[in-house]
Design a protein with these regions (language model features):
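Structural beta-alpha unit
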Residues: 1-16, 86-118, 156
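Active-site phosphate/pyrophosphate- and oxyanion-stabilizing loops and adjacent acidic/basic residues
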Residues: 39, 107, 138
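Generic structural signal for helix capping and beta-alpha/helix-loop junctions
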Residues: 58-59, 102-104, 127
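Alpha-helix N-cap and loop-to-helix initiation/capping positions
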Residues: 65-73, 132
């Protein structure tokens, strides 16, 4: 069970609650764990959980290019997210997006949906001996107008 408490724990405020939670997914274990985490905190406040998968479109292609293979893979990822939510006994909605830059698309989606928080799963990677965040979570952390939670997977 996951417990989420206010950052003002000593002040006896109620646990954090959110109206709208955005969870970007890429099919990794970390992103699916983020879906489960988001559902566990959403249940507390009867929040909406919206899951997005962003297909990054190369500049050589039109933004609305037909990317059938990528779209099929994206639909599979959204199905995996729905299964993860069902394990938490929670209903989510999902959307497949095409954009030049996934980080910008995630932030734009959070703004459009008036999300209170973005929950992102990040893998534990140490490419040069140090833990390092990849481009997308770094960009979301820098530019999102709402709270952002990064859920890092444990080291293996």
């Amino acid at each position: 069970m996951i417990n989420v408490f206010s950052r003002h724990e000593k002040s006896k405020e109620a646990p954090l609650s959110f109206r709208s939670i955005l969870v970007p997914v890429d099919g990794s274990d970390a992103s699916l764990r983020a879906v489960e985490f988001a559902c566990s905190i959403a249940r507390r406040g009867h929040s909406k959980v919206h899951v997005v998968h962003v297909i990054e479109v190369r500049r050589a292609l039109r933004l609305d290019a037909d990317l059938t293979e990528e779209a099929q893979r994206g639909e599979e990822i959204l199905t995996q997210a729905e299964i993860a939510a069902k394990r938490q006994d929670y209903q989510i909605d999902g959307e497949l997006l095409q954009a030049r830059d996934a980080g910008h698309a995630i932030v734009d989606e959070a703004i459009e949906r008036d999300s209170d928080i973005i929950v992102m799963g990040v893998p534990y990677t140490r490419p040069f001996g140090e833990f390092e965040l990849s481009r997308i979570p770094t960009q979301v952390m820098k530019t999102a107008p709402c709270e952002v939670v990064l859920l890092r997977m444990p080291s293996e």
